[in-house]
């Protein structure tokens, strides 16, 4: 390769990129400014992966599942670090969310657990992005997670969103917002969902209360304040 004249090498790369959408996007992510148009192309690449590995009904069968999830992970690993390296943090976040939405809504034979593999990768990239964000970007991320807790992906993958929201934001202002959010959830459980005969509703209520207490401790509430809050829910043995 070192012996190829630079103009001929550029011509070869240009020809290959024109016939390979994935290669084109990778080159553009690494070397070109990131424009809204390029983000559209990256998100279209996510859609193309889903289309390529699924049947007419949108189902990814067992024999294509691994290739499908590998393709999504490769798209993450080839683009997100490059976007972050160039300080396009919100664009990286946008791409991760697009892939999480794809895996979270794709009908798939998940016998090998590939869905969780992709979702775990998304979670780790969310963590990396959050660590590099400024305060405004953290608020934007927080708002996104808050707005997408329900009906965004298949039910068990919603846990990734709620877990990230509750476990990964530690700025005082965002902790206060989480406290308020949990209060709203607890009130909602009390009014609509909680029933002593419902196992899932019962433990949903309990988990929210316990998480609320942990937040109070992180926010340095006094022992007396925490004790008084516990007393409000003393009918729950776990509290």
Task: Describe the function of each predicted region.
Residues 1-239:
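Eukaryote-biased, non-catalytic alpha-solenoid scaffold regions
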């Amino acid at each position: 390769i070192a012996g190829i004249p630079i103009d001929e090498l550029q011509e070869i790369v240009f020809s290959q990129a024109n016939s390979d959408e994935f290669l084109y996007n990778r080159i553009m992510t690494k070397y070109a400014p990131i424009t809204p148009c390029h983000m559209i192309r990256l998100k279209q690449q996510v859609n193309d992966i889903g289309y390529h590995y699924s049947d007419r009904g949108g189902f990814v069968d067992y024999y294509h599942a691994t290739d499908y999830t590998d393709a999504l992970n490769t798209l993450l690993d080839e683009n997100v670090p490059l976007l972050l390296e160039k300080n396009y943090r919100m664009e990286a976040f946008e791409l991760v969310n697009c892939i999480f939405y794809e895996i979270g809504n794709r009908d798939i034979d998940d016998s090998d657990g590939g869905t969780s593999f992709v979702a775990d990768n998304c979670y780790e990239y969310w963590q990396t992005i959050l660590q590099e964000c400024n305060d405004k970007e953290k608020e934007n991320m927080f708002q996104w997670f808050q707005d997408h807790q329900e009906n965004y992906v298949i039910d068990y993958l919603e846990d990734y969103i709620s877990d990230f929201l509750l476990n990964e934001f530690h700025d005082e202002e965002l902790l206060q917002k989480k406290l308020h959010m949990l209060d709203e959830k607890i009130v909602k459980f009390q009014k609509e969902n909680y029933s002593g005969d419902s196992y899932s509703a019962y433990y949903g209520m309990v988990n929210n209360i316990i998480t609320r207490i942990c937040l109070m401790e992180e926010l340095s509430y006094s022992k007396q304040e925490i004790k008084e809050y516990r007393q409000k829910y003393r009918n729950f043995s776990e509290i």
